[in-house]
Curated annotation (Swiss-Prot):
PROSITE patterns: LGT (PS01311). The lineage of its organism: Bacteria, Pseudomonadati, Pseudomonadota, Gammaproteobacteria, Oceanospirillales. One of its GO terms (molecular function) is phosphatidylglycerol-prolipoprotein diacylglyceryl transferase activity. This is Phosphatidylglycerol--prolipoprotein diacylglyceryl transferase. Catalyzes the transfer of the diacylglyceryl group from phosphatidylglycerol to the sulfhydryl group of the N-terminal cysteine of a prolipoprotein, the first step in the formation of mature lipoproteins. GO terms for cellular component: plasma membrane.
Length: 269
């Protein structure tokens, strides 16, 4: 068993203000996406400008935060929301959903695409390779916060998390997700998109591989206590939400290869 590196989840405290590592990880994710976007924009043959990248990151940040919070409440805390709707705005208490954040980003990118007269999927194809930076950083934030741990296990790298009331040796599933949803997914998408691919393909690859990785990790991740298993004694909410991503992702890749259309330059309205 490996000792859990008990890091204070509060990185900096200035008087009554506390800056949590989880919040810093969000900033790292947005900053990393911005830098990668600027790098790719210079090599886009005029399809993307620095202004477009800056605006896209801003729109995306709004989508992630608003969608992530609303999704968490609807997917994981709906009964509590019905009893007390004010929990929706209590962001400081924690609780964000990837799937809600994804829907929020898609909605935000719809408005961004309209502003710049771009095809929505051209926008998501450009941005998709940068998303794993934020996903990986977020999972490190989960690990530092000692939350979203895995199931009990006897593997040699198991850890006991200080916030676990049962104090059992568990899979460090946050690190598995960091490795798969962060590092592996970034490498796959970054190298796949090095050369311009047909429309839909990069977005499809993101949905396909994220869905696969999330479904796999859910087998060793402790399900949310307020939900438990959805069916069969093993199907989790995360797997149920990720399965459509795999199906849609595969469909987008096939559609992209069949249509074989490519993004076109555009200007703001």
């Amino acid at each position: 068993m490996i000792s859990y590196p008990n890091i204070d989840p509060i990185a900096v405290s200035i008087g009554p203000i506390s800056v949590h590592w989880y919040g810093i990880m969000y900033l790292i994710g947005f900053a990393g996406a911005y830098l990668c976007g600027m790098y790719r924009a210079k090599r886009s043959n005029g399809l993307w400008t620095p202004e477009m990248v800056s605006d896209a990151i801003f729109y995306g940040a709004l989508g992630v935060i608003l969608g992530g919070r609303v999704g968490y409440i609807l997917f994981y805390q709906f009964p509590a929301f019905v009893d007390n709707p004010l929990i929706l705005v209590r962001i400081w208490e924690g609780g964000m959903s990837f799937h809600g954040g994804l829907l929020g980003v898609i909605i935000a990118m719809f408005f961004f695409a309209r502003r710049y007269n771009k095809h929505l999927v051209d926008v998501t194809d450009f941005l998709a390779p940068f998303v794993p930076i934020g996903l990986g950083a977020g999972r490190l934030g989960n690990f530092i916060g000692g939350e979203l741990w895995g199931k009990p296990t006897d593997v040699s790298w198991a850890m006991i998390f200080p916030n676990d009331p049962l104090q059992l040796a568990r899979h460090p599933s946050q690190l598995y997700q960091f490795a798969l949803e962060g590092v592996a997914l970034f490498c796959i998408l970054w190298f796949f998109s090095q050369r311009t691919k047909p429309r839909y393909c990069v977005s499809g690859m993101f949905l396909l591989f994220y869905g696969i990785f999330r479904i796999l990790v859910e087998f060793v991740r402790e399900p949310d206590i307020q939900i438990g298993y959805i069916a069969f004694g093993w199907l989790t909410e995360g797997q149920l939400l990720s399965l459509p991503m795999v199906i849609i992702g595969a469909g987008l890749i096939m559609a992209g290869l069949k249509l074989n259309t490519f993004p076109k330059a555009s200007t703001s309205k």
